[in-house]
């Protein structure tokens, strides 16, 4: 019995020794690779139970990380092929003057540590990335990104290639994403193409450029689904259809300081409001049955144009233009991004030339998804209404 116990103990000791040797080799390989790439690390630690890798105070010319923790798969260690399936990065910042850091947690399809060290990673399987900023960006602190496949190639000196398949951000499907980036030059640049599944040739392009402490983002697209666009922009879901858009954001020390948005939505609906049914109560117009048969709380439109700019936690709508078969509208307003409340003043006109001088002023307020409204019965509107009724009775 003692011999048996001694034999078992010897085998266990041999296995543990072998595993620790493997871990030591992994640790040495990591240290060598980091030194070759001019990445400074204060300490590298490996543990066996559970298999994990920890790096502290990582610094490069592009970013710094206070702590990186990686979880390893146990069995591949026997073959000298360490595989990772989880990464956590604490207090990551893009440069020393950045005033907004982030924590990133990743649950990934298992991949080889050798791939990571060679800067070419292939991921096959469902993966999740969660990014949480210390300070909100555009009213949001947390971003959840998922995908089924990925190719991450940072091996070239001047350009990185990043590809995602079946990607989604904050539960909004984005489809295929391809990014070309240069983070090593003084003027860091990135171009991302987003190709979602849609019933037309839709495409969005995200351009990023950073010079010193200031960065600029341009986000533009053609025939892009409005619902997905508004979800990405953290806007209330008030429209559907497809949109052409052009958006510019400026950041200083990673804080958003300026934003301009131009969005032209086409062939969609205003959700939660039936303007035609509302207007028919006040305009002396006999709309045909086809226009009034849709009694749901939506308004179909041909075009809906928004020109907005960002002011702290509010979006100021400088210009709102609406075109439907029966109505034309112009207006302006404010969207509170923190409370998702809207205050919009819209002037509605009939497309019927006989009533082109009659303007119905409406104020929408409260929750953007289900707003309340009031008609501004000004003296001017009363005179217009009286004149329109007289004209109709002639």
Q: Which role fits each region the language model picked out?
A:
Residues 37, 61, 80, 122-123, ...:
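Extracytoplasmic/secreted proteins and extracellular or luminal domains
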Residues 28, 35, 42, 99-119, ...:
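N-terminal secretory/membrane-targeting helices
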Residues 5-19:
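Hydrophobic membrane-insertion alpha-helices, especially the h-region
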Residues 52, 57-59, 84-110, 127-137, ...:
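Small-residue helix/turn framework positions
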Residues 146-149, 177:
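Extended beta-solenoid/beta-helix repeat architectures
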Residues 15-98, 362:
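Terminal hydrophobic membrane-targeting helix
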Residues 393-394:
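Short, solvent-exposed mixed-charge patches
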């Amino acid at each position: 019995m003692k011999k048996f116990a001694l034999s078992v103990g010897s085998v266990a000791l041999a296995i543990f020794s072998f595993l620790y040797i493997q871990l030591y080799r992994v640790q040495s390989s990591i240290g060598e690779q980091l030194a070759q790439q001019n990445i400074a690390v204060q300490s590298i630690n490996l543990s066996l139970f559970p298999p994990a890798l920890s790096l502290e105070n990582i610094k490069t010319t592009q970013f710094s990380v206070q702590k990186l923790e990686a979880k390893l798969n146990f069995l591949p260690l026997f073959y000298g092929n360490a595989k990772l399936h989880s990464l956590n990065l604490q207090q990551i910042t893009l440069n020393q003057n950045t005033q907004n850091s982030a924590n990133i947690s990743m649950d990934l399809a298992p991949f080889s540590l050798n791939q990571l060290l060679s800067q070419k990673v292939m991921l096959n399987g469902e993966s999740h990335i969660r990014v949480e900023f210390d300070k909100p960006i555009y009213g949001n602190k947390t971003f959840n990104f998922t995908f089924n496949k990925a190719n991450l190639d940072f091996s070239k000196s001047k350009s990185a290639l990043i590809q995602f398949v079946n990607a989604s951000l904050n539960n909004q499907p984005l489809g295929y994403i391809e990014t070309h980036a240069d983070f090593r030059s003084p003027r860091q640049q990135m171009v991302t193409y987003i190709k979602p599944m849609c019933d037309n040739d839709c495409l969005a392009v995200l351009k990023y450029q950073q010079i010193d402490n200031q960065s600029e983002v341009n986000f533009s697209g053609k025939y892009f689904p409005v619902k997905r666009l508004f979800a990405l922009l953290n806007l209330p879901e008030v429209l559907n259809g497809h949109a052409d858009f052009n958006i510019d954001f400026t950041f200083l020390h990673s804080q958003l300081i300026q934003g301009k948005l131009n969005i032209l939505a086409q062939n969609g609906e205003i959700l939660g409001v039936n303007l035609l049914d509302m207007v028919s109560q006040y305009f002396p117009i006999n709309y045909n049955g086809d226009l009034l048969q849709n009694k749901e709380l939506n308004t179909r439109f041909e075009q809906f144009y928004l020109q907005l700019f960002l002011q702290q936690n509010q979006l100021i709508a400088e210009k709102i233009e609406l075109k439907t078969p029966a109505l034309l509208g112009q207006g302006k307003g404010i969207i509170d991004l923190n409370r998702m409340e809207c205050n919009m003043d819209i002037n509605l006109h009939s497309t019927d030339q006989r009533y082109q001088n009659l303007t119905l002023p409406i104020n929408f307020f409260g929750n953007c998804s289900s707003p309340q409204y009031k008609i501004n019965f000004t003296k001017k509107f009363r005179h217009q209404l009286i004149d329109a009724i007289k004209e109709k009775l002639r």
